[in-house]
Amino acid sequence: MTLHLHDSAAGAVREFAPLVPGQVGIYVCGATPQGSPHLGHVRAQVVFDVLRRWLVRSGYEVTLVRNVTDIDDKILAKAAEAGTEWWAHAYRFEREFSAAYAALGVLPPTVEPRATGHVPEMVELIQRLVERGHAYAAADGSGDVYFDVRSWPAYGELTHQRLDDMEPAADADPRGKRDPRDFALWKGAKPGEPATASWATPWGRGRPGWHLECSAMAGRYLGPRFDVHGGGLDLRFPHHENEQAQSRAAGDGFANFWLHNHFVTMSGEKMSKSLGNVLGVPHLLETHRAVVLRYYLVSGHYRTHLEHSENSLVEAEAAYSRLEGLLRRAAERLGGLAAGEVPAAFAAAMDDDLATPTALAVLHETARAGNSALAAGDEAALRTAAGQLRAGLDVLGLDPFAEPWASQTTGSDAARTALDVLVRARLEDRATARATKDFATADAVRDSLKSAGIVIEDTPTGARWALEGEQ
């Protein structure tokens, strides 16, 4: 089976074929670092990290570009409220986002451009649009430059909307616009704004519009046409619609596929700062393992909303621990464990529009087969099942023997180590009792451990233990 992905522009699942055989270019909208990252922010990056890993596993060379919108109206406003320089404010939260991505095992992008480092490319793109009759400088002398939506008949094709049904663009004062739906390519500097937040252009000093930034950076690093543009569902309109319109109006083919992940929700509502229902990533990592947080984020299909409740991460911890536990017991029994090939059913699920819930179900079934092989002492079957499990978890960024998880010592890991010491001491007491035929004491030890949720497995090489539900 070949990879099929849902293309938002087509409104359907299509067979994926890269523009250049063997190579895939992906642009993912990154952070606007105005505040700390929350669970909804990082879902998008985990989703496209999984896509990247699956493409690499499938033999492609992947270039992934993830931008940083480090100049924006919201950044200027937040920095002014905090009494800090706008660039310092942006950099502070950019580092928080980078730390959150790294904590969740998101691979570094091939390129991570900042908007402020690509103003010349943005000015050049505006000039092309002006020359082609698709952009104009505001007549009020504000220094604003707008995209003329009525000059581009295909405007609205990405989101399947008619122009006359759209709301006015709220990114600038409408007084200088020919049509209220025209959107800003360049924003003229305004009184009271920091001088450092503007650049000289043929239209006066100012700063780039949000939509223009991504088009210019995507073109700079991926060329005029590339394979996949990704981002959250909330970016489809107006951001991605505007990106596509301005890029194609300038003569670029732009993205061949558009992929959009859905939201993390709480009580059915999108997680957002404006609603005050966000769960900050740094806060969550104080009480939960990062790998469990990632497991939770990949447990739902990327095109469905992921409902979060107080039990979500508890359930994710239990589910991941079952997979992790089998791998650790297999590695102990086999003296090490190499990744094998992913199960065929896992590959089929991933090729079916990244059906990660189905892929995880396959891995849990594989783990059950591994546990059966372990109990039966069938090391060949154990090696096969555990190797397949490890390979599948690696695609999802969840392999406990790979970085960043292999080198982490979390509070949960430390607790597991301490528990292991205590249980092994009790198992030694049980072994001594059995050796002296004191079976009453041996049974009492076993029963006390069982009542604590610890299951004992007697093997030819000695007793082993697991938490109930892991075996």
From Swiss-Prot:
Biological process, per Gene Ontology: cysteinyl-tRNA aminoacylation
Pfam families: CysS_C, DALR_2, tRNA-synt_1e
Cofactor remark: Binds 1 zinc ion per subunit.
Location in the cell: Cytoplasm
Segments of this protein annotated with the region Disordered: 164-201
Catalytic activity, as annotated: tRNA(Cys) + L-cysteine + ATP = L-cysteinyl-tRNA(Cys) + AMP + diphosphate
One GO cellular component, as annotated: cytosol
SMART domains attached to this UniProt entry: DALR_2 (SM00840)
Family note: Belongs to the class-I aminoacyl-tRNA synthetase family.
Signal peptide (UniProt feature, chain positions): none
The protein, known as: Cysteine--tRNA ligase
Annotated Zn(2+) binding sites: 29, 214, 239, 243
Keyword Cytoplasm: yes
NCBIfam families: cysS
InterPro entries given in the database record: Cys-tRNA-ligase (IPR015803), Cys-tRNA-synt_Ia_DALR (IPR015273), Cys-tRNA/MSH_ligase (IPR024909), CysS_C (IPR056411), Rossmann-like_a/b/a_fold (IPR014729), tRNA-synt_1_cat_dom (IPR032678), tRNAsynth_Ia_anticodon-bd (IPR009080)
UniProt cross-references to SUPFAM superfamilies, sorted A to Z: Anticodon-binding domain of a subclass of class I aminoacyl-tRNA synthetases, Nucleotidylyl transferase
Ranges spanned by the short sequence motif 'HIGH' region, renumbered to the chain: 31-41
Cofactors named for this entry: Zn(2+)
GO molecular function: ATP binding; cysteine-tRNA ligase activity; zinc ion binding
E.C. no: 6.1.1.16
Quaternary structure (record): Monomer.
Keywords of this entry: Aminoacyl-tRNA synthetase, ATP-binding, Cytoplasm, Ligase, Metal-binding, Nucleotide-binding, Protein biosynthesis, Zinc
Gene (UniProt): cysS
Organism of origin: Kineococcus radiotolerans (strain ATCC BAA-149 / DSM 14245 / SRS30216)
Motif ('KMSKS' region): 270-274
